[in-house]
Amino acid sequence: MADVIAVLERARSLELEIKTQIEHIEQLRRISKRAVESSAYARETVAKLARLEREVNTSIDLMCDAKAEALTYISFLTGEERAVIEGYFILAKSWQRLANDLYMSERRIFMLRKSGLDKLIRRYGDKEAI
């Protein structure tokens, strides 16, 4: 059985990685729009953009698989615990942002995180403690 914490962390790290790659691609698109005076530079930028988009597509495929696996575990949870675990591991939100979005204190968020992860570990097992 897969290590539930590792599965959740993998989904989160891929989400963060893809957000960074997409931001880089958006910057390159803005640069390519301004690079009209030099056709060689524009060609080079477009080629780099195409390569990065292919890499992002591959990463997105991996992320979808990782999120699907993580969601099979998370689906066991309900209510506030699920909202906190899903927000952090699937949507890659910070704890502060989750607290604001869910209208809760950070302390409450951390309590829900702990109880949710404890339930997942009891249900699915884990080699290491939180």
Question: What residue spans do the PLM features occupy?
Answer:
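N-terminal interaction/assembly modules
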Residues: 1-73, 97, 126-130
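Short alpha-helical segments used as structural interaction elements across diverse proteins
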Residues: 7, 64, 79, 104-105, ...
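N-terminal positioning helix adjacent to the helix-turn-helix/winged-helix DNA-binding module
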Residues: 66-69, 73, 77-81, 112
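Short amphipathic alpha helix immediately N-terminal
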Residues: 76-93
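Helix-turn-helix DNA-binding module
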Residues: 91-108
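DNA-recognition helix of helix-turn-helix
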Residues: 103-123
